[in-house]
Amino acid sequence: MNLVLMDNNILAAGDYAIEQLEKIIERGYRVDFNQALDARLVNDRFARLLAKVKWLQNRIRFGCDTHSQIKDCERAIAMINGYGYRGEYFLYTMIGGKSDFKESYERVHYWWVRNHEIRTSHLPGAIYPYAQPYRNPDNPNEEIPRWQKDMAGWVNKHQIFEITDFHNFKPRKNFRCEAYLHHYGIEVPQTGMEKVTSVEQLTLF
């Protein structure tokens, strides 16, 4: 049986969450916590169970809307992988709103570098962010800034995201996203991974 579950905070339920995950495993359900899990709440016991769950699309979803959540996601991913999980991770990533261009770019680019490391090392467990442009709840008709649309267009197309860094992405004729980095005073990598070869070089924390 396939189950799409909309609870975005099941791990906050403590022992009840443990019971539900154990039932899911015992009954062989294939599940998707569609609204994402909270990586901050993943402990050793949860990690062990999450690694055993049969996931729809072989994918676990987390949220990564701030720089601080990068550490939380990395910790949760390492714990779950430590129990034998070999599937993918899908990270909802809000861009815009309280996060300016620089913060949004550096947070998403962190996962681009991270995913590049995983792919070039032939390791399991690809990590894909999913960029969600901020929508003002008080003004739903407010136009989304062009940079948010372009960043989402780059991030959310896996076939492009896997092989093209943001500065080389061309969302339309005669425009390359390198222009955004110049505009916001961010150093442009010379070619792909020449200047940034590992996540340790991204001083994001």
Where in the sequence are the language-model features?
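A short, acidic, amphipathic alpha-helical segment used as a generic capping/interface helix at domain edges
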Residues: 44-48, 73-77, 102-107, 117-119
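Core AdoMet radical
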Residues: 1-76, 87-97, 126-130
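Auxiliary Fe-S-binding modules of radical SAM enzymes
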Residues: 98-205
